[in-house]
Amino acid sequence: MRWAKTVIVVKIQGGLGNQISQYAMSRWLQNKYPEHQVKLDASWCDIHAPGFELVQAFDKNRLQYLLATPKDVFRATGIFHGDTANQVWAKVYNKLVRGGRKLLGNSTEIQQQVASGYPVTQQIYHLDKEHDWYINGFWHNWDYTSMLPQLQNELVYTPWTEKKFAALQSEICGCNGVAVHIRLGDYSGSEHDILPASNYYKDALQQVLDKLPKPVIYLFSDEPEKAF
């Protein structure tokens, strides 16, 4: 039996920045492979904070996406996910399928390797149009410049409903606002923490001061008391 239309499933995971890149990848894939139906697998968001932030932050009426069902994910990967995957028989089945596909080299799951940065995964350019695919990665490095107008039309923030945020938005739009994000939290003391041994923020702000008249800095952080 053959399904009516081949499907490409893009995994949604991580915070809003990651989810934006994954959404952009899904739109790029839909443009490149119009014969496929591209869907988003948001099941990761059901069990991890902060959830499916993409639809919380942006206007749902502008976003263009279809959610993948468990059946879609099974089609694309050939293995069980979610609650079913925790059952003993499903674990055995999944292990056998993964092992067989690794041995034969015919996996339809593309896993972006991120150990050393975010390298381009060339296989993305040459997907077999007769197969279903599961795309798992972050895709920060992807060149989306050719489709920026499309993304800008779709990724439109939901209007503020609280008066204080609406007032702040009006204030920012009326000046040379510069947003500075200082990530602390899980980054503090880790290999990703650039604050102790770097002038990254100082140098960046100096460039802003040199090039922009009367900038207003809006600083945000997951630990604002430390960021200041």
Describe each PLM feature range.
Residues 53-212:
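Secretory-pathway luminal glycosyltransferase catalytic domains
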Residues 33-47:
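A short beta-strand-loop structural module common to alpha/beta enzyme folds
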Residues 39-42, 181-182, 216-221:
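Short beta-strand segments
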Residues 21-29:
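Short amphipathic alpha-helix
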Residues 11-21:
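A short, glycine/small-residue-rich beta-strand->loop->alpha-helix junction that serves as a flexible
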Residues 3-9:
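Extreme N-terminal starter segment of soluble prokaryotic enzymes
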Residues 28-35, 211:
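A short, Lys/Arg-enriched amphipathic alpha-helix followed by its capping loop at the start of a domain
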Residues 16, 207-228:
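Donor-binding and catalytic core of enzymes assembling or modifying cell-surface/extracellular glycoconjugates
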